[in-house]
Amino acid sequence: SKKNIFKFFKKKGKFNLKFDMISSFAIFYDIENPNRFCEDIYNLLDENGIWILEFSYLPLMLKNLTFDQICHEHVTYYGLKTFKKISKKNNLKIIDAKLNEINGGSIEVTCAKIDSKFKESKNKINKILNDENKITENSFKKFNSRIKKIKKDISQFLKKYKQKKIIGYGASTKGNVVLNYCSISNKDISYICDANKFKFNKYTPGSNIKIISKNKMRVLKPDFLLVLI
């Protein structure tokens, strides 16, 4: 349980426990003090241990237009160049990195202590870093313009089919980002269906749309489903 995990790590200072491998998936962009976090990782790692982490990758967010990643939980948005500076500052080195399409575009990074036995995959790492150098201020302006177009397209669709029955599919965090950015409310969408029974009869924040079960959605027979997952 969460309580036992906290209890375990609170006690870790009482003995010299080191780890061969530490994983941090979908967490690094939630951390308010990444330097302190990396310092703790360094202290917990064995001299030849590795740290594997995966986080939403800013350049792919720009490319794939996954603006629904931008929410209150994600306090930072990293490229490899920025992460490399943070890890180096805390005596860690990147030994491998690869991109994937998880959550609309992520990067998996493997780190080790600077003085460890591991060699860096310089060709792979430098390829990613060189590609990042192509990102300019204009890249963000284009990102902004494309987001605005999506908002316009969705608004036009909802207006065009205002007399039809439209139900949202998935009461997710990302979906709520889209709903609120596009100013969609219960005037535009009748309901949102979800598989999680704990969400039933609750309402989406900001947009105030009632959440129902998938079974009820099927009974209602909507004309359109707006996918929000």
Regions found by a protein language model. Name each.
Residues S145-K162:
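A short, well-structured juxtamembrane/interface segment
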Residues N35-I52:
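A short glycine-rich, Lys/Arg-flanked "PGG" loop and its adjoining helix->strand segment in the class I
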Residues L53-T76, L80-T82:
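Short, glycine-/aromatic-enriched active-site segment of Class I SAM-dependent methyltransferases
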Residues L92-N103:
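Conserved S-adenosyl-L-methionine
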Residues D20-S23:
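A conserved beta-strand element that flanks and buttresses the S-adenosyl-L-methionine
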Residues N103-K148:
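Flexible, glycine-/basic-rich loop-and-beta segments that form/coincide
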Residues I27:
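Hydrophobic adenine-recognition pocket in adenosine-nucleotide-binding enzymes
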Residues K2, F6-K12, F157-I229:
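A solvent-exposed beta-alpha-beta segment
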